[in-house]
Regions:
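Conserved, single-site charged/polar hotspot
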Residues: 1-271
Length: 271
């Protein structure tokens, strides 16, 4: 209750401040070679939050209310998380993949001291996942983490009923044929890359999530970011996360016949 209340009030406060600002809020930077975009709440100007992913799938209390929930709300009435004089933006993800991501790697480049990189384990140390070699080693293995669990009792406490149907979220794989991937990217971007030659991570965040991805095709190349733009481009809906590595298979004349994406975590990983 305290976390959800803090997140909600932080969004209301942010909207109020943005509406009073003389500088327009920008969530997209584009030129002929690059599109960097993040998704927050710009999809709706007339209300503060919604039930979509960019609003933490906020559903209020009508969809998840019972005597225990009502009692918790009553017992914590008026309580919020604070960062000095500011209400904490207490956003969260389903599974960080072992290390939490920094806010500025997923949204506007404004650091939040309460939304930074932390190891999701009793042991606080972790490798430099902005380094491609370290990130690949991390993603291809299954390090100990609190979110590395298949315990149904634990998952039932933190996931909605429909989310509990997904079990391979700590480490996962997605495979595309050349035809599937090239058609998907063409449809999602509106650009004709021709056959896809490569997907190249140009920049990773603190949790190993790709923040800039270069798509290389026979006809053109283009760089996209941030994490949700990448996830939406490479999936009919969106990938579990942008913390992934790419294996190219059955390469003929420099063109792979298959792409295998091996990934870590579920969601943006922040919080």
């Amino acid at each position: 209750a305290v976390i959800s209340r803090s997140w909600l009030l932080a969004q209301v406060e942010k909207n109020f401040n943005l509406n009073g600002s003389v500088t327009p809020y920008k969530s997209c930077y584009r030129n002929n070679e690059t599109l960097i975009r993040w998704y927050d709440r710009e999809d709706h100007d007339l209300f503060d939050v919604c039930a979509d992913d960019h609003c933490q799938r906020y559903q209020g209390i009508t969809r998840a209310s019972n005597p225990i929930v009502r009692e918790v709300i009553k017992e914590t009435r008026g309580e919020v998380l604070m960062d000095n004089d500011t209400i904490c933006d207490a956003r969260f993800s389903k599974c960080c993949g072992g290390v939490t991501e920094k806010f500025e790697n997923c949204w506007e480049p404004v650091p939040h001291s309460s939304l930074t990189a932390l190891r999701d384990d009793e042991v606080p140390s972790y490798p430099d996942l902005t380094d491609e070699r370290e990130a690949e080693q991390w993603i291809r293995t299954s390090p100990e983490a609190f979110c590395n669990t298949t315990d149904k009792e634990i998952l039932s406490q933190v996931l909605n009923n429909y989310d509990q149907e997904t079990t391979d979220f700590y480490r996962w794989k997605v495979e595309y044929t050349q035809e599937e991937l090239s058609r998907l990217i063409h449809r999602k971007t509106g650009m004709d890359f021709g056959p896809i030659i490569d997907l190249i991570p140009l920049e990773r965040g603190s949790a190993g999530r790709i923040t800039k991805l270069k798509i290389v095709g026979v006809r053109r190349s283009f760089t996209i970011g941030k994490e949700l733009e990448i996830r939406r481009t490479l999936s009919e809906t969106h990938l579990y996360s942008s913390a992934f590595v790419v294996d190219k298979k059955d390469i003929r004349l420099d063109i792979p016949s298959r792409f295998i994406l091996t990934g870590a975590g579920w969601g943006h990983g922040v919080g």
